[in-house]
Curated annotation (Swiss-Prot):
Residues 28-102, 138-208, 243-319 form the PAH domain. The gene is pst2. This is Paired amphipathic helix protein pst2. Its main location: nucleus. GO terms for biological process: negative regulation of transcription by RNA polymerase II; transcription initiation-coupled chromatin remodeling. Heterotetramer of alp13, clr6, prw1 and pst2. Keywords: Chromatin regulator, Nucleus, Phosphoprotein, Repeat, Transcription, Transcription regulation. GO terms for cellular component: chromatin; nucleus; Rpd3S complex; Sin3-type complex. One of its GO terms (molecular function) is transcription corepressor activity. It comes from Schizosaccharomyces pombe (strain 972 / ATCC 24843). Residues 647-700 are annotated as: Disordered. It comes from the Eukaryota. It is found in: Nucleus. The lineage of its organism: Eukaryota, Fungi, Dikarya, Ascomycota, Taphrinomycotina. Has a role in chromatin assembly and chromosome segregation. Involved in the deacetylation of histones.
Amino acid sequence: MEQTLAILKNDNSTLVAEMQNQLVHDFSPNGTALPELDIKAFVQKLGQRLCHRPYVYSAFMDVVKALHNEIVDFPGFIERISVILRDYPDLLEYLNIFLPSSYKYLLSNSGANFTLQFTTPSGPVSTPSTYVATYNDLPCTYHRAIGFVSRVRRALLSNPEQFFKLQDSLRKFKNSECSLSELQTIVTSLLAEHPSLAHEFHNFLPSSIFFGSKPPLGSFPLRGIQSSQFTLSNISDLLSQSRPDNLSPFSHLSNESSDFFKNVKNVLTDVETYHEFLKLLNLYVQGIIDRNILVSRGFGFLKSNSGLWRSFLSLTSLSPEEFLSVYNSACSDFPECGPSYRLLPVEERNISCSGRDDFAWGILNDDWVSHPTWASEESGFIVQRKTPYEEAMTKLEEERYEFDRHIEATSWTIKSLKKIQNRINELPEEERETYTLEEGLGLPSKSIYKKTIKLVYTSEHAEEMFKALERMPCLTLPLVISRLEEKNEEWKSVKRSLQPGWRSIEFKNYDKSLDSQCVYFKARDKKNVSSKFLLAEADILRSQAKLHFPLRSRSAFEFSFVYDNEIVLFDTCYMVCTYIVCNSPSGLKKVEHFFKNILPLHFGLEKDKFSIFLDQVFRGPDYDVNAPNIVGNKPVRRKRSNSITQLTEFVKQPKINGQRESRSAAAARKKEESGNKSQSNSQNSLSDESGNVTPVSKKQLSQPAAAIKASLKYPSHPDSLLEHQDHAGDTENEMHDDVDKEQFGYSSMYVFFRLFNLLYERLYELQRLEDQVSIIQQRIIPNPVSQKQKIWRDRWNDLSDVPDEKTHYENTYVMILRLIYGIVDQSAFEDYLRFYYGNKAYKIYTIDKLVWSAAKQVHHIVSDGKYKFVTSLVEQNSSASPKKNYDDFLYRLEIEKLLNPDEILFRFCWINKFKSFGIKIMKRANLIVDQSLDTQRRVWKKYVQNYRIQKLTEEISYKNYRCPFLCRNIEKERTVEQLVSRLQTKLLRSAELVSGLQAKLCLDSFKLLYLPRTEDSYIDASYLRLRDTDFLDCQNKRKQRWRNRWESLLKSVRGTSDNTAEVNFDADINALFIP
């Protein structure tokens, strides 16, 4: 309601004031203005009653405008107001204050109907006559007037004086020098010989309801009103400028919807704007756009009329509060002023500037901007760097826009020129040849048609065509129109021929253009996975930690990673091993030993479970991870070579991946081919006896890519891992929560663990995106309109064969394996990721390069000469035998002996409690083994426990050990044990000990510090045996004894009074003897 009143007061208070002034000026006898309070009261009452029917209010204000502009006379005004407000008799009665004293509304209720009467200067009119209004069309358009003048000129060609008289009469009527009746008499007499023209002239006269001339005061014919002939539903039609005759209302539309469209047509006076609004509604009806887009776009059409906008929201079942949230989310975060300017936040508007004076602050704009503040106005906007796919899409849109712009401009020019041609065709033949046009051809836009003609006729001949159109339009227009139509059809034909190519380019580049990280991440990742970069990063982090955190530099790790998902950890190892087996089968024994024996020691894994899992790679994809790994009492060892042959058989087919096989692969393949022939009989016999090994035939050795693709499945994990069972105490190599592993290594191992961690993190992030895949897939719902138009792109058909696993993570894992085998190319792999993950999985694009780098580091580790000695030291350090305090130091010294002088020593620590893996760079000159803070605390705890127990300390000689006891206080006839026992017994009987003293040891300075407010107390046992009264008497005696001593002490002090001594005594003695 408040909003409606505000609109009424702000937008239409001027019109109400003008209405009051007009009524008072014409009909008030004294010419005095009405009180302003009456106007405000009427506006408030009008707003309160018409807040839910805005179209009634619009009709009322239009009639007031018509009265003010002298379009209707006063009786017409009263009649229309009575029809508009026929449902509001109280408003009609209140309106009497604006009428002259001789006019007044008289209402007499009779049921639902009422009778309207007027009191006039000649008396009241009690019997109203029937008033049936005939409403002609509004004045004809400009072109019809020109055609009428041309026909009159041709009719009066033989008598030019009559034509001049007609022109003079029209000029006098325009200047209010003659009345309408005089003009009508003159024209009728001049066109007496041409009755058809005289009758046509009457169509141009203001004879409709809004164009009746106002008679003199006091001579108005008073007419009654028949409400059945003139109802409120016709008001909107009377107020519109034109109404097509071929419009017919739909029978299924409600009254509210019908009134809404009529009011929209009245508000959107421009026909093209009204058609654009109907097109927007049509898009919503067809399901191309949703309700939010409809409301946000429709606000631009109807925001000027608040009542109509509320009706539109009610039709869409959307509240104003919901619209604000939709519109604010669709628009900018800042308030807008037009399509280009945004209001800056307060902190941006209040920037200090010392170079301005008062005048500059008054005229310069600091609130609204349309240019970024971080860019220079001279240099223009800084365009964001685009990827090649974005460049292709931009170029495609520019080509489409160019064709659309030319076709639209040509169509508009043809339409405009045809209107001029039709107007010229209505002229006589003699006038057509001499008819000329002004510059610009009288079109609303001069630039559009000029650019179109320059585009068709080139710039050299365009000026000649402009002059010809202005001087000889009758001859030039047909030629230009035909040429433009020919060119327009040519451009449309070319556009249709280019549509398939444009659609193909769009299909190839659209998804990639949305993935902005695609290209740049590949370039960065190639640098980030290099050994040089990883080693330099470790050195930089170590120096920064030492500079900013000097106290933590000895114990903190440069890198710390968390491996809390064992399934992803297993999958990471499986992927690296698969790449090595597939592409580099040489040295598999060392690789298998490294993964099955060395890697579990670094990550706290169970060797048996991890070894069974990796047997799927080293023994074949058909290996059962839950089956026992033995045949009888001996393990099956011959199957590994056969499974390797199956996995590396893909190398025999270089046509699949388009690459040449390496020398090592070729050598291994020849060796296996020669060995398979001699071993086939033994293999067959072994498989028959055990039943666990499948014989390998020539067909299996030469299987095609389709068979390899079918054999690639997601690796099956052991049941104990999938079910998360607790196998406490089942295996020898089980890791406890308080057992951590510390190993030492060199640069190749450090680089491998860094690459291994990157691979683990990307697979782990891929697993976490499992929930978002379904959300992304819901957005790929086909639009029925696009399917009907055959422009819908089914991206599923463009993908290669998608694996059929349980989850999307497993499907993606199998796709990575196919990429490693070369079955799927890089482009198809990226399209698969974009289809399921959108732009979230861009880190997986280079996973094959990352796996290759990790496999390369594994080969560097196992092919190094010191690998055998380092692995033996690692296994010896990880043994379950008890270690001494200096074993870690000796282990480190042995590792340093194997390294070159310029090589870096690394320490790898696995903290099983937090599932974290730390890497630290060690100094070669540092002879003290650096330990983490948790390790130091654990060692200190162990030291305190050893200190308290009664046993000999290791590596300490007791040859020269002397006891610090005083021999004179020890009874000679007793031993030390007897003396200690006697003293303890006597102490327990005579005193009560309460131990509360606490101490701590600083790890950095090794200082023993006692905690404040902690102490040991001894209580004599005799006090504990006393009764309460005896205890109080004893305490009072002691208190009195202290008092006497205190008084004597105070008297000996010079300058101290007794009063002061008494006060201090009471304060201190009571504190000393509080029980």
